[in-house]
Amino acid sequence: MSIKTRKIGWIGAGRMGYEMAQRLARGGCDITVWNRTRAKAEPLARDGAKIADRLTDLAGCDILFCMVATYADVKEVIAGPQGVYSNARAGGGGVPPIVVECSSISLDGSAELREILAGFGSKYLAAPVSGNAKVIKAGKLSFVCSGPKPVFDEVMPFLKLI
């Protein structure tokens, strides 16, 4: 599948997440972005991104990226009462088959997230980043990835675009 035919969900439009999502949008990806403060994500629409009203709007994406501040935030947006997976618990709707977590979270948090996602049948790639917004704009962001090789291979074209 082409990167332009995969549906990408993106959570987090802060300093780093905004720039990362923007590179995907400008690269022609079909990307839908959610941010707690919607106004911070709205400018991404000029680059072709769709803006989600609810986290559950991202449940039907092929690959979900998450770039938020803390593990508590990660857990809330993924598995919280209003999180991406909240309808799946109630039996209403699909879930992303792949989740790529780009925040810097603890090893324990990453292991817990992997277990939560596995319970829904989703695959997990830990992909914390090294760099800043200037590095992202220059296309030089570094990822430190951990997870199954087939998942890494599937996500790699998007990581390269970022």
Give residue spans per PLM region.
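Active-site-adjacent beta-strand anchor residues
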Residues: W34, M67, S103, C145-S146
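A short acidic, helix-capping loop that chelates divalent metal ions and anchors anionic groups
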Residues: A41, V74, K134-K137
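Rossmann-fold NAD(P) dinucleotide-binding segment
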Residues: L55-K123
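NAD(P)+-binding Rossmann beta1-loop-alpha1 motif at the extreme N-terminus of oxidoreductases
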Residues: M1-C66
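Rossmann-fold dinucleotide-binding core
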Residues: S104-I162
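Class I S-adenosyl-L-methionine
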Residues: A25, E42-R46, K75, R114-A118, ...
